[in-house]
């Protein structure tokens, strides 16, 4: 944490307001210094940041949570570190309060309870689907947010509550009187499943949802021999008895496997059946009272139309077949037509019967086509062809001479390739090397990790540009997606606004509100304003690989052969353009040239793709 003129900073985030303390974090409202967007920072206390056991589990949980999005869950952008303290950057929300605060002096209608429990079940189903559980569902861990005056479920402690159970109880004992503390702990224990002995899984969450639903409906906990909701709410249209009692089963295996489906059945499809059943009983009594004691002959009850539809019984004939020996029946040579006629009715069926043998067909394994990951496509901008000027008299020697070139029209990605796009390519090829054993990417220098054979993106970095990628990796990805790398000439023309010949992609000047440079890390693509052509991140964020080999004096040759120049035929280095997140301002000029070995790996190197006009 850094102090500047009495203003509190955490990395690139300026603290605006305190929001309070949660179970595992101090929450503050902050604004990014450069992109001027507000976030909520969840700052871990020093004792948790220094705990290896907690941080190991914390990192695993954050990775999983960052991969999902739900209105009732914390939307994680990234995780950062300031000194020895970690903090989680999350999306700004409108503020929340605990369910206990919301219920204070308030009685919810049945429809409100259905709305809240449905949202809770939806969020938990998503959490359970990625192998996590909440672990501590109760009136203080479940929060509500408000939209247009309607309360909505919000779960700020998903995945962490069970890790900090002892910390929670210790905090409760240190605040308030002993009587208040014991009462609150008792209420918390009411939500815990009977089998819980450090086991906080899906089944425990289901049990807690049952307790919460009962409390919201009845206003008390289902303790001991408790009355069913139907007794407390005789006018209810919903089968709360079925849903709540199924959640509160003592055996874990007997509880619903899918909370959302169990709630849907009890509050929609089955409610009509229950209502019909309750209405059918009086009708049955009326039928019994009105039933006559003596009935007429059955024939009198047959309608005229039914007589016309009588089905005549089919008469079956009994046929006696003279038995013959098997040898006689199997004789295939016939002396006369009479013998043929007399025996074919018996011999042919018998031959067929005796010749019938079990047929075992050869097992042929059904070939199943392996489903490979499909690419995530990027929107492209068409750059119109024509004659352009490139080079600069204000830069380095390799930017001279300034000369005109001619290019055909081409397409260019609006932003660099991101981690979530590149990870699909790696999953498809199944390796970090190409067929010639060239490295495509070095994972330890990127935001992509391999754990237990699976590729995982660091939390919050899915939309950041991929880094640590070599020229071989960039070129292979472009080929896989049906595109190519842009030439150095194409890149400079696109960055400078075509025929406008701008100094920077943003215009004649540039500052930190327009690009990510001289900072501490990459930012998500498209975080800054686009260029005049609609391209993002052409300045800063990451250097971008180009197709060309680099030559110090290539512009001299290009001036003589100006039609679609594509660099020298061979070389040692490949061209990089655009500057990066830690570059100085001068490196962001459209004409600035950078280069490195095609196998070089750097946390500032990325790329974008181009495509010819067909």
From Swiss-Prot:
SMART domains linked to this entry: S_TKc (SM00220)
InterPro entries: CTDL_fold, Kinase-like_dom_sf, Prot_kinase_dom, Sulfatase_Mod_Factor_Kinase, SUMF_dom, SUMF_sf
PTM characteristics: Autophosphorylates on serine and threonine residues. Present in elementary bodies 40 hours post-infection as 2 proteins of approximately 70 and 65 kDa; the smaller one may be due to differential phosphorylation or degradation.
Keywords: ATP-binding, Kinase, Nucleotide-binding, Transferase
GO molecular function terms listed in the Swiss-Prot or TrEMBL record: ATP binding; formylglycine-generating oxidase activity; protein serine kinase activity; protein serine/threonine kinase activity
Assigned EC number: 2.7.11.1
Signal peptide location: none
Induction record: Transcribed after 6 hours in infected mouse fibroblast cells, that is from the mid-phase of the developmental cycle.
Domain Protein kinase: residue ranges: 13-276
Catalysed reaction equations from the record: L-seryl-[protein] + ATP = O-phospho-L-seryl-[protein] + ADP + H(+); L-threonyl-[protein] + ATP = O-phospho-L-threonyl-[protein] + ADP + H(+)
Residues binding ATP, per UniProt: 19-27, 42
Enzyme class at the top of the EC tree: transferase
Main function: Together with the serine/threonine kinase PknD, may play a role in specific interactions with host proteins during host intracellular growth. Autophosphorylates and phosphorylates IncG, an inclusion-membrane protein required for the modification of the nascent chlamydial inclusion.
Name the record gives this protein: Serine/threonine-protein kinase Pkn1
Source organism of the structure: Chlamydia trachomatis serovar L2 (strain ATCC VR-902B / DSM 19102 / 434/Bu)
Gene giving rise to this polypeptide: pkn1
């Amino acid at each position: 944490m850094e102090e500047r003129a009495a203003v509190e900073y955490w990395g690139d985030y300026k603290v605006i307001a305190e929001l309070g303390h949660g179970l595992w974090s101090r929450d503050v409202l902050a604004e990014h210094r450069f992109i001027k967007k507000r976030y909520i920072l969840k700052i871990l206390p020093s004792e948790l940041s220094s705990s290896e056991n907690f941080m190991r589990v914390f990192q695993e949980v954050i990775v999983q949570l960052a991969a999902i999005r739900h209105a009732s869950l914390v939307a994680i952008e990234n995780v950062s570190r300031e000194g020895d303290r970690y903090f989680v950057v999350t999306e700004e929300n409108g503020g929340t309060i605990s369910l206990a605060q919301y219920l204070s002096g308030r009685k919810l209608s049945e429809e409100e309870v259905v709305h809240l429990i449905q949202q809770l079940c939806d969020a938990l189903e998503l959490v359970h689907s990625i192998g996590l559980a909440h672990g501590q569902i109760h009136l203080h861990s479940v929060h509500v947010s408000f939209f247009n005056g309607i309360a909505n479920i919000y779960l700020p402690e998903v995945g962490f509550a069970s890790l900090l159970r002892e910390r929670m109880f210790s905090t409760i004992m240190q605040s308030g009187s002993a009587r208040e503390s014991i009462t609150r702990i008792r209420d918390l224990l009411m939500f815990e499943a009977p089998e819980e002995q450090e086991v906080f899984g899906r089944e425990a969450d289901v049990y807690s949802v049952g307790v919460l639903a009962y409390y919201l409906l009845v206003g008390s906990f289902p303790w001991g021999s408790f009355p069913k909701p139907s007794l407390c709410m005789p006018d209810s249209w919903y089968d709360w008895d079925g849903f709540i009692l199924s959640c509160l089963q003592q055996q874990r295996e007997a509880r619903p496997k899918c909370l959302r489906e169990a709630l849907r059945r009890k509050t929609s499809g089955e409610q009509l059946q229950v209502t019909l059943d309750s209405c059918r009983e009086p009708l049955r009594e009326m039928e019994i009272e009105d039933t006559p004691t003596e009935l007429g002959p059955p024939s009198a009850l047959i309608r005229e139309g039914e007589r016309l539809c009588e089905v005549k019984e089919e008469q079956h004939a009994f046929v006696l077949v003279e038995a013959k020996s098997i040898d006689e029946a199997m004789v295939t040579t016939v002396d006369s037509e009479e013998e043929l006629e007399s025996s074919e009715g018996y011999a042919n069926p018998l031959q067929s019967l005796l010749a019938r043998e079990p047929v075992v067909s050869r097992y042929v394994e059904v070939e199943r086509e392996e489903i490979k990951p499909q690419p995530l496509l990027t929107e492209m901008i068409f750059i119109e062809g024509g004659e352009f000027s490139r080079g600069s008299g204000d830069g380095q020697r390799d930017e001279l001479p300034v000369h005109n070139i001619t290019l055909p029209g081409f397409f260019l990605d609006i932003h660099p390739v991101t981690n979530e796009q590149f990870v699909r390519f790696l999953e498809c090829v199944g390796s970090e090397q190409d067929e010639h054993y060239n490295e495509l990417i070095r994972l330890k220098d990127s935001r992509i990790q391999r754990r237990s054979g699976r590729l995982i993106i660091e939390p919050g970095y899915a939309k950041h540009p991929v880094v640590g990628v070599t020229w071989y990796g960039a070129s292979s990805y472009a080929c896989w997606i049906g595109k190519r790398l842009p030439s150095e000439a194409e890149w400079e023309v696109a960055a400078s606004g075509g025929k406008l010949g701008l100094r920077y992609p943003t215009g004649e000047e540039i500052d930190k509100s327009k690009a990510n440079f001289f900072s501490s890390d990459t930012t998500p693509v498209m975080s800054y304003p686009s260029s005049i052509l609609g391209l993002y991140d052409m300045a800063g964020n990451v250097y971008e690989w180009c197709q060309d080999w680099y030559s110090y004096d290539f512009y001299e040759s290009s001036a003589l052969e100006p039609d679609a120049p594509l660099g020298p035929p061979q070389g040692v280095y490949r061209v990089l353009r655009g500057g990066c997140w830690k570059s100085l301002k001068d490196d962001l000029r459209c004409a600035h040239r950078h280069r490195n070995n095609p196998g070089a790996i750097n946390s500032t190197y990325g790329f974008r793709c181009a495509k010819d006009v067909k």
